[in-house]
């Protein structure tokens, strides 16, 4: 039967759009028929969906070459999933863009590299992944044609910078030191099962783990929302700054803040008066220093590269005055998360890179902007966060318990408080779960609370003080919102070498 000819990218795209609504079951059956007619072997694993579309739908043999899938049309086909969760539309995984050939890649010129040759013109077919639904029932829902040279100029520069950074590692004989965390949009993702396999690429240099070019999951999420849903306008973290090939984005972030190190918060508030008093005050000052119109975490670069901003105020011993919080979690959604690396906690706490801006007091007792750093959780601590995630899921599954205790409010009046059985700070010394809301709420659903699918067990005191005997007792139907936190003592150890004396 042989390959069907596609001379133009328009032909390929038209055929791709005709696949919308056809189930994977149909595609796999067509693929199997094509393979039988052409004496081809069926491929198993993550790539089999792409192979099934190429062979079954496009009648075109899958290739592993360093050139586009459709040579004459000069276009590379990708089939990738998105999902919908409490945070909206998200890419389910990174987009693999082919094996990194340490030995044979043209590391001297980006536009002549194997990466560029194969991926400069992409046709991306998106399907929705739904947990619990058989894969055979999925179908392509959206098709996007992406030319790298037509992406926003800032995206182009960052992608090229990432590629050139990979090239520098390889040419210096340091391919074995490559890490996804050091790249913004285009990363050298681990390829294969994640074992100890290593490849030799030069007799002089250490062997390196096999890797593939990949667009990060955070980049694909933002790309999907911008191009497929057109839900949001683009704003930049550094709108007035020209990104330079020889400078890291991380370095530019820190250099922009440097002139303000040692300045008092009061003087910064006078210079940057558009701030909200209270919790967001320091974040707003930092945003204005960067001349960003939006909150930094809503900007293009921060979302595509999965950066987070956190301002940390430390005491005289260098300990942050508060733990480091993340978004309140959905109890039912957390329980449905079976895969750790696809969880919201992993995305927010492990897969994120943090711009930490430190505030302290100077010798006069004035609060100042002390320093800033780029940080991500050390690999040795990742499993400790995973343990907290697993324990939180276990608590929800086995039953939340609310233990009644006695305390005093600010006026000194005796009150009831309720302690839950989620993992506390002594569980891992790295992360924990506790209330997210400013005020506790156990009697109704409002901005501070959630309604539980399975009511909590309320354990009351054996003896109730006389003045509290008429106080209502929760039914367990409602509970104060909860979130994951990095412990402040843990964060003290992470930032201790960056705190300056003023």
Predicted regions span which residues?
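Nucleic-acid endonuclease domains
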Residues: 1-71, 76-502
